[in-house]
Design a protein with these regions (language model features):
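A glycine-rich, often tryptophan-bearing local segment used as a flexible ligand/cofactor-contacting loop or short
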Residues: 169-254
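Catalytic beta-strand/loop cores that center a nucleophilic Ser/Cys/Thr
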Residues: 86-95, 225, 229-315
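Helical hinge/lid and interdomain linker segments adjacent to catalytic or ligand-binding clefts
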Residues: 70-81, 111, 121-208
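N-terminal secretory signal peptides that target proteins for export/translocation
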Residues: 1-8
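Extracellular ligand-binding/catalytic regions of CAZymes and related secreted enzymes
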Residues: 30, 41, 46-49, 56, ...
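Short beta-strand segments enriched in small/hydrophobic residues
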Residues: 106-117
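Boundary at the C-terminal end of the N-terminal hydrophobic targeting segment
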Residues: 25-31
Length: 360
């Protein structure tokens, strides 16, 4: 199912978000997310089935509720595709007005948003944000799909960049048809290696692994790493700008910044600076001893290297991954949207950047 999101006027948004403007102002001021409540009566259609239905969130160590937790974007086993109105308003406020570079030609982006298993609450807003980034800046046009039927070579051929929007698990697998699974996998690898772009958001780094073991080596290497553990939202970290000269980091002005989000760690053997060009990472030296102790000893990286975003070449293609964005409020930050914009333009082949591995 493909979704066409029409532009929502600012006046309409003001009416829809009545009573939430003060909350939004506070959220932007302190870096926290607005109310996690889903609007009663807010349209959830169009929807698509989600295998297995909703999965309850994990409890943080010691039990209790996760602060600021939003439920999955699933109602009665079907995936919500409509973002919340106050989130839309906040994103529109934060969007850049111009592309990082002028596109070399009209670009088309396919945003694949079907969840496998855990359907992150941020999926509808992430898809909307990518579409609006392209529309506002003229950098690309966007098609959003929630259908696995679109995951094939013929569909991919129509697009310059494929965005994997918070996919998790073995999202291409068909247990009833191994041959179909292999066709999907081959289509993805061939698409990227032939000179196209691949962009992965947050939970897309939590795919094709079981614990610390990769399940699809070619994919695991192409992506650059896979999830092992995370600090629960709202974990505070200082984001370090590893390559201040990169045009993908221009929105950060070379300055580190503090963010609150769910912070991924990547399995020791899956991520290496010998395989990717790191753009940003957690400044582990500025994390408190108490926060460091939250991570189980068995998942800690021996090198203390907790990268957040990176780029790499895969054949003739280009890959951009950003681990931030579990919480919707991350998409309210102009500097993060600049990073996403530049990352997509890099993947499309419009923005040149040093993508040699950070370590040799």
């Amino acid at each position: 199912m493909r979704i066409n999101l029409t532009f929502i006027s600012r006046a309409a948004l003001l009416l829809c978000a009545a009573g939430s403007s003060i909350l939004l102002a506070q959220a932007r001021a302190d870096g926290q997310t607005p109310s996690p409540a889903q609007h009663a009566g807010e349209p959830a259609a169009p929807l698509v089935p989600v295998p297995g239905g909703a999965i309850p969130p994990p409890a943080p160590p010691g039990g209790g509720a996760i602060p600021g937790y939003r439920p999955q974007s699933v109602v009665n086993g079907v995936q919500i595709t409509t973002p919340q109105y106050e989130d839309v308003f906040a994103v529109l406020d934060a969007l850049p007005d111009a592309a990082t570079v002028k596109p070399k030609k009209p670009r088309k982006i396919l945003v694949y948003s079907r969840a496998q298993g855990y359907a992150h609450s941020n999926i509808p807003l992430t898809a909307f944000t990518i579409k609006e980034l392209g529309d506002r800046t003229g950098a690309w046009s966007t098609t959003i799909t929630y259908s696995l039927e679109d995951f094939n070579a013929a569909t991919f051929a129509q697009y310059d960049v494929l965005v994997l929007n918070n996919t998790t698990g073995t999202y291409l697998d068909d247990p009833e048809d191994p041959a179909r699974t292999q066709r999907r996998k081959a289509a993805l690898l061939d698409y990227v290696r032939s000179g196209h772009g691949l962009v992965l958001t947050h939970a897309s780094g939590d795919s094709y692994h079981r614990g610390a073991t990769g399940l699809w080596p070619e994919y695991n290497k192409m992506v650059g790493g896979f999830f092992k553990w995370h600090w629960y939202y709202p974990q505070q970290v200082t984001v370090k700008i590893d390559d201040p000269k990169s045009r993908l980091n221009a929105g950060f002005d070379g300055k580190p910044f503090i963010i609150h989000d769910e912070i991924y760690t990547f399995a020791q053997d899956s991520f290496s600076r010998k395989n990717v060009h790191v753009l940003t990472s957690v400044d582990y030296s500025k994390m408190s001893a108490e926060d460091k102790e939250k991570e189980p000893k068995e998942t800690r990286r021996t090198d203390g290297d907790y990268a957040l975003s990176w780029i790499r070449r895969e054949g003739k293609g280009r890959v951009f991954y950003n681990a931030l964005g579990h919480s919707e409020h991350v998409l309210f930050m102009p500097k993060v949207l600049q990073h996403l914009l530049a990352g997509i333009q890099y993947a499309a082949g419009d923005l040149d950047a040093d993508d040699r591995p950070s370590a040799k």
